[in-house]
Amino acid sequence: MDSSAITIFVLLLLSIYFIATFWVFFDRYYIINSRISSEARSLKALYTGQSKSVASNSLIFTYLSRVTTPNKAILQAASSDAIRVSTKGLTWLSIIAATSPFIGLFGTVIGILETFSKLGSQSSASLSVVAPAISEALIATAAGIAVATFAYTFHLILKRKAYELSSLLASQSEVILSQVEE
């Protein structure tokens, strides 16, 4: 492989993006899923009357334990804070999904420019000389698209999981507020 320093840098950057994408996904997926399980158990206990308040491992428990009478503003603040903390890293997935195809394309353009530059200095240019160089340059675009596909897919999965968590927290808040009103 006779790649330029820029092409190698582009592929290295895309490799870092790839690792970061999987790191953020698995980390956040585990955290959000465990919180969903915890909040679902807490909500079930509220619905069935096993408990008059959220479980102590609930994300909104800390907020509720500080006030004598829960109100909508406190519960919304608790829910918003829990979602904010749970979805850390989603912005990075968006950035990676949006930028990696362009980074890959940049690597391809540089590779093709270098190929044409080398061809200009040679006396003959046959397909056997041009094709391997151009196919090597296209690897950067393929890598960028692959990284973007994973990042975008993982972003959507985590966004859906965050919505599930938000719904559970909202349901718990509604049950708690209805108990206060009684």
Feature locations, PLM:
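Transmembrane alpha-helix/interfacial motif
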Residues: M1-K44
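Alpha-helical membrane-interface segments at transmembrane helix boundaries
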Residues: M1-S4, I83-A97, S128-I139
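Alpha-helical hydrophobic packing sites
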Residues: I6, Y29, I103-F106, A146
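Membrane-embedded alpha-helical segments of inner-membrane proteins
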Residues: S15, S121-S128, A148-A151
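Predominantly long cytosolic amphipathic alpha-helical stalk/bundle segments
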Residues: I31-A125, T153-E182
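Hydrophobic alpha-helical transmembrane segments of polytopic membrane proteins
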Residues: A137-T153
